[in-house]
């Protein structure tokens, strides 16, 4: 599969750079990320339902990681490239370390 992302990740990019008052970078990073990841999954009610189950199932994930994991699992994406070791708690997802 090509590189993919979700609307949640794009929201996080905007949130982070807006919080830093770097709106110029918010737009630039957002656009570059969309170019790198041509597949963008929406976040649906099914995703938030699955994230709720992951969080309340005490699988060791934070809410944001659970949301990302739910979108991945619901779209049959099983590999993530990230620094975030929280994904190691999920047997269904393989984490490619960026470290």
Question: Language model features by range: what are they?
Answer:
Residues 1-58, 73-74, 90, 94:
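PIN-domain endoribonuclease scaffold, especially VapC-family toxins
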Residues 7, 65-69:
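Conserved glycosyltransferase catalytic-site signature
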Residues 61-62:
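A beta-strand edge to alpha-helix "cap/lid" segment located at domain peripheries
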Residues 69-99:
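Acidic, PIN/NYN-like endoribonuclease modules and their adjacent C-terminal/linker elements
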């Amino acid at each position: 599969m090509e590189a993919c992302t979700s609307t949640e990740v794009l929201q996080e990019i905007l949130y982070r750079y807006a919080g830093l008052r770097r709106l110029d970078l918010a737009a630039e990073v957002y656009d570059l990320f969309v170019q790198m990841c041509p597949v963008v999954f929406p976040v649906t009610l099914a995703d938030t339902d699955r994230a709720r189950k992951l969080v309340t199932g005490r699988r060791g994930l934070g809410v944001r990681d659970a949301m990302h994991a739910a979108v991945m699992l619901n779209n049959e994406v099983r590999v993530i490239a990230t620094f975030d070791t929280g994904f190691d708690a999920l047997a269904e997802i393989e984490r490619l370390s960026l470290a």
